[in-house]
Amino acid sequence: MTNQAYPMALVSQDSLDSYIRSVNGYPMLSADEERELAERLHYKGDIDAAKGLILSHLRFVVHVARGYSGYGLPMADLVQEGNIGLMKAVKRFNPEMGVRLVSFAVHWIKAEIHEYVLRNWRIVKIATTKAQRKLFFNLRKSKKRLGWFNNGEVETVARELGVEPAEVREMESRLAAQDAAFEMSAEDDENGMAYTAPVLYLEDKHSDLADNLEAENWEAHTTQRLSMALASLDERSQHIVRARWLDDDNKTTLQDLAEMYGVSAERIRQLEKNAMRKLKEAVGEF
């Protein structure tokens, strides 16, 4: 690994530009290539394999870091923190999980960047508790306008984020009570036209690509796990689960299944309950 491409070697904007050009030159891995390297690292502790996994994903870290550019924090630092998350993810990645490294690593990358933002962006110091941090990192996704939430929107946001409505109001107030020098230019201040600072938005719209990629990988992984879990059930249990839960257009009633199998509806309910329990256990094993 050259000094130019080493994840921690970021100091100035010029070196960052050079770094980005360098990491974009590393080829992306196919699924088979990635698995081979992951197995070498996981089972044999192969450091060269770890380097291969890291280098091939450095461009993804840059992509994620750009989503946090609105804070005015040095992009080099954001990338550097993201790289720390990537290295932690590579160290913990198990090739038997059945997902691509990018899906696993994105959580670690974002976690490191989030912590960096919370440590260094002065306005974010308003978010100190776990609930407040959760609100801070999700509130902008729920806002449909720049003004205050109405009561209905507060209830919706609170329900979606699993917090109390009062906490939503408190965080909204804290976000509104910004540092004026950071929030407004002198001209805007003189004209009485304060604007909402872009730092209120953790990630810009360009980060959706990473989110979509992550979602697609996890959806495929979940579908595979569900199929394998269903296959572990007996034929009758499979049919009951499919008829009751997997056929959205024609969901079968307990009574219909009872007549089909010549048993009571209560017996079908018991079979369904047992099948769902086994299915949950089986999904957890794969």
From Swiss-Prot:
CDD domains: Sigma70_r4
GO cellular component: cytoplasm
Pfam families: Sigma70_r1_2, Sigma70_r2, Sigma70_r4
UniProt keyword Transcription present: yes
GO terms, molecular function: DNA binding; sigma factor activity
Domain of life: Bacteria
UniProt similarity note: Belongs to the sigma-70 factor family. RpoH subfamily.
Protein name (record): RNA polymerase sigma factor RpoH
Species whose genome carries this gene: Vibrio cholerae serotype O1 (strain ATCC 39315 / El Tor Inaba N16961)
